[in-house]
UniProtKB/Swiss-Prot annotation:
Mode of membrane association: Single-pass type II membrane protein
Protein known as: NKG2-A/NKG2-B type II integral membrane protein
GO biological process, alphabetically ordered: adaptive immune response; CD8-positive, gamma-delta intraepithelial T cell differentiation; cell surface receptor signaling pathway; innate immune response; natural killer cell inhibitory signaling pathway; negative regulation of natural killer cell mediated cytotoxicity; negative regulation of T cell mediated cytotoxicity; positive regulation of natural killer cell mediated cytotoxicity
Keywords: Adaptive immunity, Cell membrane, Disulfide bond, Glycoprotein, Host-virus interaction, Immunity, Innate immunity, Lectin, Membrane, Phosphoprotein, Receptor, Signal-anchor, Transmembrane, Transmembrane helix
Segments on the Cytoplasmic face: 1-70
Modified residues (Phosphotyrosine): Y8, Y40
Amino acid sequence: MDNQGVIYSDLNLPPNPKRQQRKPKGNKNSILATEQEITYAELNLQKASQDFQGNDKTYHCKDLPSAPEKLIVGILGIICLILMASVVTIVVIPSTLIQRHNNSSLNTRTQKARHCGHCPEEWITYSNSCYYIGKERRTWEESLLACTSKNSSLLSIDNEEEMKFLSIISPSSWIGVFRNSSHHPWVTMNGLAFKHEIKDSDNAELNCAVLQVNRLKSAQCGSSIIYHCKHKL
């Protein structure tokens, strides 16, 4: 045995197919694990995105009114407009009509003071009568027509107190007293005899009466004298 030499040789055995397949097994498992992790991450991202979109829709839904709410709001708005228009119609139109009626009534009162118990504007009230104090000088007949156009008569004197009052207002004015001649009596516009004394009655040309400073006197009917009108209430 000592004489026999020990022979060392390298055995070149063919590779074992099973071992060759086992080596890549670890790599394959790691790849599969990585793929699973990626897939799981993608699923998580997708789920998170869906949750975010769902929450966003929820928030938007909370902020925006639904279709029935919009309809109700629109109906309420229309009702409010109708009510406002009705209020304006009820308040404005009657007030306008009332104002027109008042203006018409005022004109009627001014033209026909006897029917309402008040004197027209710019007239003076004294002892249940209205007096228009004229500033124009006219003849007796012109003064008579001017007072008639004002729904009144030429100034008449009922008593001494009224004469004093009128003398304070105006020193001189025509009165509604006349005569046909010096041989006829003095009469009023109603044809009644005038009882107060009239000065200068002897002059045949002076057939119309004038109030002058607390007394009555005769004057020519064609003279231009201030006139006053009287209207009994």
